[in-house]
Amino acid sequence: MEKENIRLFGLCLAFLTICNTVVLAQYIPQEPNYADTTMWITRDGDAEGTGADVFYVVSTWEEDWTTENGSVCHFADVRNPVHRRHMAIEINRAADYMAPGNRFYAPYYRHTTMETWMTLNKDTIANRCRLAMGDVCKAFDHFLQQRDPQRPLIIAGFSQGGKAVVELLKHMKDETYSQLAAAYVMGYKVTPEDTAACHNIRPAQGDSDTGVTICYNTVKDVKYIQPVIAQTCMGINPVNWRTDATPATLHDTITVTLSPEYHVLVVSGYSGSEYKPYKGFLNVGDIHSCEPWLYSEQIRENMQLRSRRLAKKRGR
């Protein structure tokens, strides 16, 4: 019996060693250096110097991938030309409507892959996002060191980038928060745990309050809410800036109504067919991929309004 126990112990030890080897074989890309200008996409659309500084965080673009030596990676590589090109597609499209009248800054970062989110496992997502959010916080700190603190500040992000906005609100000091015109969490959730952890997360109540968080997620029906992304405790309609169920008309044919119970936008008259379903996970009744684009005109105008309101409050 004693020999059998020793043999089993040896097998367990070998198994743990194998498991550890698997963990060690996972590849972590090199950390970005945010003093390097190649780690950023920036645009200066503020010739008069009267606009805001917009810090934008890109969403999830990469799937799990394998290095040449067979190691699996769950993160984007900011030095991989293909990964950079993917992130740049979204960043440049966001800059097209966020940069005019403002100064726009967006870092490349080691965002975690789609497979991470598809696990639907809170611990896995939290553990892998820790590295990604660490990159974003470091980029934000570098950005703060360079910018004029008298200018209004806007932070915005889509999907995983929306999660980053929530984490930045927790990360920023009160002095930085006092410079915040608004934070835009597009296509991601704000949870009761988030609001309990951070007094700087305050839901927007209208179109012009400042220092607030604008959060929205779009679905065809509340039954399509994806909990890992959109089970939120706050929401506002970016078409009429209401927090009740008053419907709004967008582009003449689309009706957008906030569900006060679920805090998501329910749309009718819009199929979202340009956004193909992704592996049964996204765009399957939710219209996740539309978030930064469907309401872009309203978001652009709102950023300007809240920035002007904050500048007036601060005597600029």
In which residue ranges do the predicted regions lie?
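Bacterial Sec-dependent N-terminal signal peptides
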Residues: M1-Q26
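Basic, amphipathic N-terminal segments that precede the first structured/catalytic domain
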Residues: A25-D46, T50, A76, N80-R84
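Loop/turn elements at helix/coil->beta-strand transitions in domains of secreted/extracellular proteins
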Residues: T50-A52, P100-F104, P149-P152, S178-A182
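Short beta-strand element of the alpha/beta-hydrolase
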Residues: G51-S59
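Active-site catalytic motif of lipid deacylating hydrolases and related acyltransferases
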Residues: V58-R151, S273-C290, S296-R316
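Surface cap/lid and interfacial helix-loop subdomains adjacent to catalytic sites
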Residues: A132-P149, K170-R309, K313-G315
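Gly/Ala-rich beta-loop-alpha elbow adjacent to hydrolase catalytic centers
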Residues: G157-G161, V165
